[in-house]
Amino acid sequence: MRSALSLKPSNGNAAKSQAVNNKNVIKNAPLGGKLTRQIGTSNLLQQALPSKKIDESPIIKIDAKDSFKVFEDQEPEKENSSENVDATEKDSNVIPAEDNNMIHELERKMEEKSRAEKLKFKFMQTRDNSDITSRFSEPPSEFSVLCDDDDCDKVSVASSTFTTSVRATFSSFHFDENQRKKEFGKEEAVKKIQKKAAKEARDDSMFSSEEFFPDIIKYMLHRQTKNRASHECFDIQSQVNEEMRTILIDWFSDVVKEYNFQKETFHLAVSLVDRALSMFNIDKMRFQLVGTTSMMIAVKYEEIFPPEIEDFALITDNTYRVPDILLMERFLLGKFDFVVAMPTSSWFGTCFAKRMNFTKKMRNTVHYLLELSLIDVHFLRYRPSDIAAAACCFANLQADVESWPQKMVDDTGISTEDFVDVLRDLHRMYLNASTADFKSIFYNYSETAQMEVALLPAPTDKLRSMFPSIFVTAPKSSNDSSSPQ
């Protein structure tokens, strides 16, 4: 309840007119349940108070209303409170419903926040017939598992036999770390097999395509003549010699076998080392660093799952640190002008073997000969395509197949006269591999996994019959087919 206070100024006429205005405001007040504030005004500050006289009435007069009304607020709606706005909202003296329901709006928001907090910790409540951990390899509990996967998101009341919370159950749950590693290793192995199978399928489709193969082989034969290493690269070297290069490549073979790298990675790494030897003088204390960095670059380019850079520092027995390898990588890539991919004899060998439908044993023989050619620096004088063609011819003769079919001559433009000298040097390397000083490649291809192709006899008699002027004085060894068995 409110009573109106009105200020009566010394000027009776002004007070009278003000009282009339106040009554009009009260009469015109809306009856929609809204309280209006009656504002009294005074002109005491506007006019100076006259001197007090005995006969005049007091300055301030308290008038009490004869009647008054009490208005109550309506019940606020929970949802659409903003719709409960009076039609006379334009009137500046009327307070909107939003302001009157502010407390209710805050209470509603607090309730919503409380419900959200309860849903957030919903998983902490117990269940009566199911538990999340029942899906794992934990011993069976006292409760029965009768729920579906959809029921796992529902909250149930705890039963008398199972009152432990899910959080407490998870606290006692543990994974088998070794089992997890085994499963992860199996997944990685499956991924590698799938990636390798996909790559082989792409290679088969590329090499067997009669539409695209002529353009592909023409382009690769042209590319092999660009950025080639020189067989005279050691003429500019003052501290590194051919024996050190042979030791490095023999070590490469062990690294490739240890990490199960692709054969193309091995050939590309050797190609990068030879290009570095042809470009600048290398200090012997940094030669292994150049080789390690070249292997890392080749691995990044060829492998699907390359090892970490720390592994390359580890294979050097921490002789070189990671910053040293990264610095050398920047240096080599700058020297190569970032041209890394080059056609190698491994690429041509794979291409020719697929075109001639080689067996696995014949393919292993081809790759064995190609890796032997990496050891001798004098093979740098031959083109990679000629080395690959000679290796395929050698494998055909060893398997009693036509040495170099006319179809390959038509497809590649390479004839036997182009690689007869290469074939002679490959035959020599094949015979001397078992007695060489560095036998890593020989031992690798003498294993059962490689079908022991390094132990097969060389087709010396067939080579002599085909090229009598070249293989007249061919040496004999335990691998020679013409030697007594």
Curated annotation (Swiss-Prot):
Function comment: Involved in the control of the cell cycle after S phase. May bind to and activate cdk-1 and/or cdk-2 to promote cell cycle progression. Necessary for embryogenesis.
Native organism: Caenorhabditis elegans
Disruption-associated phenotype: Homozygous mutants are not viable. Partial loss-of-function mutation bc416 causes cell division defects with a reduction in the number of dividing NSM neuroblasts and some embryonic lethality.
GO MF annotations in UniProt: cyclin-dependent protein serine/threonine kinase regulator activity
Tissues in which the UniProt entry reports expression: Expressed in the cell lineages ABarp, C and E as well as the NSM neuroblasts.
Transmembrane segments: none
Key words, A-Z: Cell cycle, Cell division, Cyclin, Mitosis
UniProt-listed GO biological process terms: cell division; G1/S transition of mitotic cell cycle; meiotic cell cycle
Keyword Cell division: yes
Name recorded for this polypeptide: G2/mitotic-specific cyclin-A1
Compositionally biased region (Polar residues): 8-24
Source taxon at top rank: Eukaryota
SUPFAM superfamilies: Cyclin-like (SSF47954)
Pfam families: Cyclin_C, Cyclin_N
Taxonomic path: Eukaryota, Metazoa, Ecdysozoa, Nematoda, Chromadorea
Region described as Disordered: spans on this chain: 1-24
